[in-house]
Amino acid sequence: MKNIKLTLAYDGTNYHGFQEQRGTGLATIQEALEKALSTIAQTPIQVIGAGRTDAGVHAQGQVVNFRSEKWPVPAEKAPLALNVLLPGDIKVVKAEEVPMDFHARFSAVAKTYRYSIYHHRVMSPFHRYYCYHEPRRLDVNAMQEGAAYLLGTYDFKSFQAQGTPVKDTIRTIYRADIIEDAPVINLYLRGNGFLYNMVRIITGTLLNIGFGKIKPEDMVKIIESKNRTLAGTTAPPQGLCLMEVEY
């Protein structure tokens, strides 16, 4: 029995998220990957993903693992073998054999996400699937001030999609940076875990700070309230990218 860890990069534009949606006929990253794996192994292969990215969300460093008794390809050659079978918008960038107790989701200690905003009057056609377009004036310095209040361990219930069945909403944020590379503004968040839609809701809240609708220090009140209605709207999916999963 082998346990193989794969690092993936994908453009999520044409997929209904990472997780397989059986019986729906909807294209997913997991479905495409398992099809390629099963073709090579000549037996059904199921993968475990580090994160379930939503429809339209991208990844540069998604991680999965799978266990198989019949996997015939050495780990170092797996990317080449798989990439021949995978569509052009999904690629395996690294493969390695790992201990049997490795679990792509539960072994993770940190994840980094990036949310990209195209800040210009006219949206670039080359960025339309990878950035959220915001033509209005933004105070980026105020947004950075607001992001700094996210650092630390808090109950982030205010930044979780309503109706999500998660009891433990306490998370730790290690990094919250806004880096402007005009006309793109990138928000980087690194934490020990993220609630459903957490990064996109944080982005919407920081945009409200950038618009001057709320003050940077209001981020503290929003966190303490544990009230989703006080946070900003959920930013669109296309600006979000899973950059790295750490173990």
Swiss-Prot record:
Keyword Phosphoprotein in annotation: no
Reaction(s) catalysed (UniProt annotation): uridine(38/39/40) in tRNA = pseudouridine(38/39/40) in tRNA
Pfam families (UniProt xref): PseudoU_synth_1
Binding, substrate: Y113
Active site residues of this protein: D54 (nucleophile)
GO molecular function: RNA binding; tRNA pseudouridine(38-40) synthase activity
Entry keywords, A to Z: Isomerase, tRNA processing
Protein name: tRNA pseudouridine synthase A
Organism: Desulforamulus reducens (strain ATCC BAA-1160 / DSM 100696 / MI-1)
Name of the encoding gene: truA
